[in-house]
Structures are given as C-alpha cells and as structure tokens.
C-alpha cells in the first residue's frame, strides 16, 4: 500500500531562522517502509530514462542517491565541497544568499555520454542542483533527469533547471 510520504516529513517553524519552515526528512529515513517507498518511486523514474549513473551533492544527495544506485545496479558519484576529493577535480560555483560556494567532482567520475540522474533531498533555489548539473556536463555526461524528495515551490528552483525532466515526490 502506498504511503502518504508527507506524514514522514517534520515541519519545524522558525528554523534555522525566524519565518522559515524547515522540512526535515529524518523521520522518512528513520521509517524503513517510507524510505523504501520514496527510493522505489525514484528508481522507477530512473528506469524509465535508462540511467547509467547517479550523482548527488554533499551530503543529503548521498542519502537519496546511493539506495537508488544500488537498486538500479549502477554507480554513484558524489559532488563534494572543497578539499574532500583526493584526485584531480572539476569545479562549479553557485550563489548563496551572501557570496558563492563551490562543488567538485573527480575528473573521471562520469564518462562522456553516460546517462546521469542527479538526486538530492530538496529542491529549493536550484543553486546546488544547478552546480551539480554543471559538473556532470563538464565531464561529458548527459543529465536525463533530476529527482528530489521535496520541492519548495515558492523558491522557484525548477526555473534554474528548466529543460531537465524533474521529479519531486512532495511539493510545499
């Protein structure tokens, strides 16, 4: 029986600052059946696209992407923060409220032409996922889709990833 995954998301008012509602996926991850169903829905989306590699940004993109990669029998490549990868990397910058941040991937993480699904827990402004897509494309990969557990529609992150088939299991 399909679960209503919204029942497994904690909403914390005024966190991390006044006026913000933080959507916490920890209860979903803590419940085996809810986590399985969320993963299975993303796996089905990926199967329909012939995905050959999953890429997820640090750190919650790992939580979403790794079980999907396992179920599909494909690899997982992390997009990490500065100083976390030991070999030669490519870099993509993205905007924060005050300044910029960067993500990195190993230069051999994705093969040219490889069909990639980019995963993360949350689509907010689209900055992190946009940088992750940029990294995959720098390496010659083909982003065939993006998948999220939650999308915060008021932040218009989908506008930054127009042209990419996108799945959000829940929208707030």
From Swiss-Prot:
Catalytic activity: AMP + diphosphate = 5-phospho-alpha-D-ribose 1-diphosphate + adenine
An individual GO BP term: AMP salvage
InterPro entries linked: Ade_phspho_trans (IPR005764), PRibTrfase_dom (IPR000836), PRTase-like (IPR029057), UPRTase/APRTase (IPR050054)
Record's GO cellular component terms: cytoplasm
Main subcellular localisation: cytoplasm
Lineage top rank: taxon: Bacteria
Alphabetical list of Gene3D superfamilies matching this protein: 3.40.50.2020
Localization of this protein: Cytoplasm
EC class (word): transferase
Keywords from the named record: Cytoplasm, Glycosyltransferase, Purine salvage, Transferase
Membrane-traversing stretches: none
GO MF term set: adenine binding; adenine phosphoribosyltransferase activity; AMP binding
Pathway: Purine metabolism; AMP biosynthesis via salvage pathway; AMP from adenine: step 1/1
EC numbers: 2.4.2.7
PANTHER family referenced in this protein's UniProt entry, alphabetically: ADENINE PHOSPHORIBOSYLTRANSFERASE
Subunit structure: Homodimer.
Similarity remark: Belongs to the purine/pyrimidine phosphoribosyltransferase family.
Annotated function: Catalyzes a salvage reaction resulting in the formation of AMP, that is energically less costly than de novo synthesis.
Protein name: Adenine phosphoribosyltransferase
Organism ancestry: Bacteria, Bacillati, Bacillota, Bacilli, Lactobacillales
